[in-house]
């Protein structure tokens, strides 16, 4: 009899401690393969391997392309590759980044949902923004079980809270109980298989690097008057997405909050560049005014002095906007 033998776990900020707890508490005879993606800098992947290997009793492996996975083993995402499942093998995809990261939690979750449906248990841990919420929703749509770490105890509550809202999670569990809960759920028979929605299949193919282009994207998204921060292409609004998401023609994907965060960074950078240019312009025109005075051209000097004062006013306005942006609360 089949069981829930695929466990996928995702997290980012503040997720290392609960992950260690889960791995320490998973039963050594758990009848499931465990796949983990944490959104970390590339250099953090090695640290994750060390932490995971020393945390529990299950063998831990760095995922490689084509690797056949086994129950009772743990597999970690590789740097700069999406961790994807295909049948009983692992695929490493070089498709576009999602929320500016690769490997992406959502890509792993979708591929598990596509190939293993109700046999999947998805878990979202502590983290910022809404990474993992879309993938958890895909697992739910394919008949799998969805779990989030209790946001009240998470170091960064956004990810589990957004996942709760987007996927109507089956369970909300403190980290101290997750290992035991997963071990017990893995022994249960899965529910009935549900039809696979075309958008889930297509987005898995995009993550694998197999499908790109605006014509393909038109099947799942409508054009939006927005620009991709990564490539400058046109973004499209993914239809009926929970949470709201966007993809560009190249395939870069963003939840609404991740896109807003990237836009804020671009606005801040643009304002700072504008401030530097105007400050330099004021300095140059002031020097031209001084040169006019030295050379007996008072009218020219006065004109340049007035212009320099105008530029300084513009610079002060931009400087106030930049300083105000630093005081805004994180969103």
Short names for language-model regions:
Residues 251, 292-299:
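Short helix-adjacent coil turns
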Residues 298-309:
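Short, charged, amphipathic alpha-helical segments
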